[in-house]
Design a protein with these regions (language model features):
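TOPRIM metal-binding catalytic domain and adjacent DNA-binding surface shared by DnaG-type primases
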Residues: 1-62, 92-93, 193-196
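N-terminal cationic leader/targeting segments used for protein routing and processing
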Residues: 3-6, 80, 184, 190
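Phosphate-handling DNA/RNA-contact segment within nucleic-acid enzymes
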Residues: 36, 49-138
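TOPRIM fold recognition
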Residues: 95-98, 106-196
């Protein structure tokens, strides 16, 4: 072996096989488009689960779909469905500040409303080592879980600060970010600006 040559370790990325009943949406899928219009979410890249009437949010890693989360459009339970469970979180946006929220819609809408933020939906799970790997890639962290989870918000702030050493702030909101409440969006924006 030549001197200086290094072995290359390639990360194997699991790829999700998309079920046949998860399709590209068409204009005739009124429940799908009504859902997107209600939340003011763009349809780009989203799919539709015709079997269970779900809006499907794919999760990508290095250009490959590794998981997807489906949101029930007609009251089918569970409301949120994980297709593989391989992805620890859903990300939206591309800022250096990480905003941790609970669900996909809150992540998408926060990224739309707040510049220079990446939103991470933890998808109803507890924080784990995989989450911390992702969190460690950012310059600071804001935790803004649903209002009924204030204790969990404070707990996550402590865990993240201890685990990563990053500046981490807990934010108490009046409602989920997905509802676009002006006070909540302004609170998050102010915390982004003043925590630099």
């Amino acid at each position: 072996r030549k001197r200086g040559k290094q072995d290359v370790v390639r990360e194997e990325i699991p790829t999700m096989e998309i079920p046949q009943y998860v399709v590209q949406p068409t204009p005739e899928m009124k429940d799908f488009h009504g859902f997107l219009n209600k939340w003011k979410v763009p349809a780009y890249g989203l799919m539709y689960d015709v079997k269970d009437a779900r809006c499907v949010f794919p999760i990508y890693k290095k250009g490959r779909i590794i998981d997807a989360i489906g949101r029930s459009l007609k009251g089918k339970m569970p409301k949120w469905y994980r297709y593989t469970g391989q992805a620890p979180a859903y990300f939206a946006g591309s800022g250096k500040t990480l905003l941790i929220v609970e669900d996909v819609l809150s992540a998408i809408i926060a990224a739309q409303e707040i510049q220079d933020v990446t939103s991470m939906a933890i998808l109803g799970t507890s924080l784990n080592a995989k989450h911390m790997e992702y969190i460690g890639e950012y310059s600071r962290v804001l935790v803004a879980l649903d209002p009924d989870a204030l204790n969990k918000t404070i707990q996550y702030r402590r865990e993240i600060a201890l685990w990563t050493g990053l500046p981490t702030i807990a934010i108490c909101l009046e409602d989920d970010p997905k509802y676009r409440r002006t006070n909540d969006i302004e609170t998050i924006k102010n915390k982004c600006l003043h925590s630099k």
